[in-house]
Swiss-Prot record:
Function: Key component of the Ragulator complex, a multiprotein complex involved in amino acid sensing and activation of mTORC1, a signaling complex promoting cell growth in response to growth factors, energy levels, and amino acids. Activated by amino acids through a mechanism involving the lysosomal V-ATPase, the Ragulator plays a dual role for the small GTPases Rag (RagA/RRAGA, RagB/RRAGB, RagC/RRAGC and/or RagD/RRAGD): it (1) acts as a guanine nucleotide exchange factor (GEF), activating the small GTPases Rag and (2) mediates recruitment of Rag GTPases to the lysosome membrane.
Protein name as it appears in the record: Ragulator complex protein LAMTOR1
UniProt KW keywords: Endosome, Isopeptide bond, Lipoprotein, Lysosome, Membrane, Myristate, Palmitate, Phosphoprotein, Ubl conjugation
Species assigned in the record: Homo sapiens
MF-aspect GO terms: GTPase binding; protein-membrane adaptor activity
Regions crossing the membrane: none
Post-translational modifications reported in the UniProt record: N-terminal myristoylation and palmitoylation mediates its recruitment to lysosome membranes, thereby promoting localization of the Ragulator complex to lysosomes. N-myristoylation by NMT1 is required for palmitoylation at Cys-3 and Cys-4. May be palmitoylated by ZDHHC3.
Length: 161
């Protein structure tokens, strides 16, 4: 889309004008009347297209920034402080509601209160592991051989006229 270029002695009028357009906060964001994003493909040139896109990105970024250094907490009145606190609380509630799926996951089970003792103990003998594997294979084969045979119809038609 663009590149960063810096030169101390080369500064054309066009570069100054582009910098002024990008850094000018008084320019309104480019939105259509219905609130939809503007159609960048209908603009006559690619340069205007890039400028409009950069202006909209800059406007969105500027609207989402909270300047903490500009807020003087001593000069703020009580009702302004309460309004901001309410606004931040609603923003946090909206953001935290999208994270509810993380709260629904069950925590990992705690099988022991002293895992260091479990990890330091002797390993499970190989014969026990083989026996568990044989039992699991036997259970799998038994479950895979279960078949349901239909002996009669599941839906019986009654002779109701």
């Amino acid at each position: 889309m663009g590149c960063c270029y810096s030169s101390e002695n080369e500064d054309s009028d066009q570069d100054r004008e582009e910098r002024k357009l990008l850094l000018d906060p008084s320019s309104p964001p480019t939105k259509a009347l219905n609130g939809a994003e503007p159609n960048y493909h209908s603009l006559p040139s690619a340069r205007t297209d890039e400028q409009a896109l950069l202006s909209s990105i800059l406007a969105k970024t500027a609207s989402n920034i909270i300047d903490v250094s500009a807020a003087d907490s001593q000069g703020m009145e009580q009702h302004e402080y309460m309004d901001r606190a309410r606004q931040y609380s609603t923003r946090l509630a909206v953001l935290s509601s999208s994270l509810t799926h993380w709260k629904k996951l069950p925590p990992l089970p705690s099988l022991t209160s002293q895992p260091h003792q479990v990890l330091a103990s002797e390993p499970i003998p190989f014969s026990d592991l083989q026996q568990v594997s044989r039992i699991a294979a036997y259970a799998y084969s038994a479950l895979s051989q279960i078949r349901v045979d239909a002996k009669e119809e599941l839906v019986v038609q009654f002779g109701i006229p």
